[in-house]
Design a protein with these regions (language model features):
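C-terminal interaction segments
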Residues: 197-246
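Non-cleavable N-terminal signal-anchor transmembrane helices
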Residues: 1-27
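Short, mixed-charge aromatic SLiMs
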Residues: 65-77, 137-151, 231-244
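Amphipathic alpha-helix face/heptad-repeat signature
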Residues: 6-13, 71-78, 108, 112-115, ...
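A glycine-rich beta-turn/hairpin centered on an aromatic-Pro dipeptide
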Residues: 146-184
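Hydrophobic/aromatic-rich structural module bridging two neighboring secondary-structure elements via a short loop
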Residues: 57-112
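Short, contiguous alpha-helical
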Residues: 15, 23-62, 100-157, 212
Length: 246
């Protein structure tokens, strides 16, 4: 996906999120049990402001976090600020990020597009409305991001965050497959490795890219995808994803 496409997806999902959450401010968010719709709107507003300030300052903003009187107003204002920072910069410009291999504005552009589509799903779940399909290119990019940058990188850089779950892994492999793209996820006891392509595996997660992305982010149940093979390793992947994406 190119920069223009990320911005296009970011805007579409922001507009959908804001419209849906406006009618669900007091509703619980099933995928984020401690939150209401208002909490969701405030969280996304805070994320947008944090990333805009990180790019503007060249450092993590401090003091943090802010407080908002009206989450919907803050959401709109901070979305405009975030997009303003993106359009003022090239994707290849330097920016501090939490992902060591990519210290660029482009990292945040991709991350905010993916952040927004997941929280758009949360808003739809809170409102009890059918979710808008996730475009295939955005969903496949999101699968790659969450497997490589959240799961694999997270398990390597912050293994302590995975507690006893990581040492229990024994090297078995799960294939994540959308038909057009596939990833091999090896659950090792010291790190999780992710590669594109095919190899031998003990289990698989198969489905449309939209469904697979939602399953990996725990925004869909098992019946949204086809699970095949060793149930233990599938459950282990599910548990590891819950930690990686919390």
């Amino acid at each position: 996906m190119d920069d223009e496409r990320f911005l296009e997806c970011l805007d579409a999902d922001y507009q959908r999120l804001r419209a849906v959450v406006a009618d669900a401010l007091t509703a619980p968010v099933p995928s984020c049990p401690a939150w209401t719709g208002a909490d969701l709107a405030a969280h996304v507003a805070e994320v947008y402001l944090h990333k805009a300030e990180t790019m503007r300052l060249g450092n993590w903003p401090s003091p943090w976090p802010p407080t908002f009187d009206d989450p919907l107003v803050a959401l709109a204002e901070n979305y405009r600020g975030l997009v303003g920072e993106f359009v003022a910069r090239d994707a290849g410009d330097h920016s501090l990020t939490w992902y060591g291999p990519d210290q660029t504005v482009g990292f945040w552009l991709r991350r905010m597009a993916q952040e927004t589509v997941i929280h758009r799903l949360d808003a739809e779940l809170a409102a009890g409305v059918q979710h808008d399909p996730i475009p295939t290119d955005l969903a496949e990019d999101g699968i790659d991001e969450v497997l490589v940058r959240f799961l694999a990188f997270g398990s390597t850089e912050y293994p302590e965050d995975f507690g006893e779950q990581l040492p229990e892994c024994d090297g078995r492999t799960v294939r994540v497959d959308t038909g057009a793209a596939g990833w091999q996820v090896r659950l090792g006891p010291t790190a999780i490795m992710v590669e594109r392509g095919q190899s031998d595996q003990e289990a698989g997660v198969f489905g449309e890219a939209d469904a697979v992305l939602r399953w990996l982010w725990r925004r869909a149940d098992d019946d949204a995808v086809r699970l095949d093979g060793d149930r233990w390793v599938l459950d282990k992947l599910r548990a590891m994803m819950a930690i990686a994406t919390q």
